[in-house]
């Protein structure tokens, strides 16, 4: 249930002054029922010519869960907007807001001796379970004040200052409130007479320079850590024949924990030429976050006997740029537009709470402060072993004198030249997928649209780059966990009938235990995950109104569209938009096709 009540008042005694009141209440109730039946699978034994049965999901069971959540929000604001002397435009906002959110849940589970009735009352009382998900039981309240003043002079000089003063119930008294100011300025240089009245520059329709700086607070990473508490159940203990569940100590409270601050600086420009025939937007940005939560490492001995609390210790920095280029034109009845975008973002750990380095090598190898978060460590690659002789004359890399190595195995680089392949030969030579915000380092795309005499077409391309994917488990080696092998492992090192090794793309097949020599992350098994995808295409035709109005239809458009039509990528088994699928268990991306019409009377 979602409800919203809004009331607006315009003051008759002062031009431009208005007040607005808003109250919203949302309530959700979620009921879940899972009935899991016991089933039997049969596996054929070729040698004995029999089918062996195995029972799964035994015994049958039923799970019921009830969840409810409520959220309310109140806003009250004063707005003042006025144009003075046809030149000075002033807008002022002052707003008060508060919100509260709470959730609760309960679940139960029973096993069945007979599963004819799929209701929880029909289950067995023996070994029944009832509980609640602790992460879905909470109550949070926020309050805040917002102020904003916006001024522009003839749409040429623009300025805005604002602030937020926010409070959160998640923090202790004295640390609940945070003040977060921001400001921005803009200068439409195209409105200056030396451009508007200078004929050689008449092609400049709009040129705006802008800069902004703002601070924001975030309380989402902490919940009531200033309170002492317990986790239940903790460890269990046996006294006599009875098992008693215990309480687990949550750790030391921290009454000083508070908002972490995010400070963002943005500098950019907007440019339109020839009435929008060409356009460009360029932005450079820096976002510095201070007070990220972390636990002290190495400063407090483990003999303290308690888990340390989180504190506002860590810092990071996002920086990058974004470029958007556009072109639109009309040639007789043909209209078209093209938009291209490219962005590069990297995240750097400015300070990461970690123990002191033992030496300079330990600092280089194991510490992450002042380093980019997308930096990945791996062995360098010298290809594959081509023969047993090649293995014997190369540094040992399995720790067993080469006893588990075979031709076709990955040949790791002896990076430090000590004749031994170990962890000391790992170095930063790959890029992880993400900047910790779910996006690759580079993103790019294109939007193309065209229209001609009622026909229209729209295309959306999307891509990413600057990151790698490494295959694991069933994509990395055959017979994983005693299962089968995927078809791409046919292209592997193998022996012919005379015992000669035939080269292949993958190492030779053997049992998983002796395959572990090929598990290590190395450049050879690290794939460039850059991609370009045709995300969507839509083609439509709008029937002329002089035809549709005969049938009392104002507008009729017929269309067909498709999504995820093709992808250009070096990855064969993983969707580059979801590189977390590098274990091979995610459902492949689907192509979707739709046909329909838009009708209005």
Locate the predicted segments by residue.
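A structural signal for short, well-ordered beta-strand segments and their strand-loop junctions
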Residues: 20, 39, 458-460
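Conserved small-residue
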Residues: 107, 330-438, 476-478, 497-499
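Glycine-rich, aromatic-lined ligand/substrate-binding cores of catalytic
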Residues: 437-471
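Extracellular/periplasmic, surface-exposed regions of secreted and cell-surface proteins
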Residues: 1-36, 50-378, 517, 521, ...
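C-terminal beta-barrel architecture of Gram-negative outer-membrane proteins
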Residues: 457-532
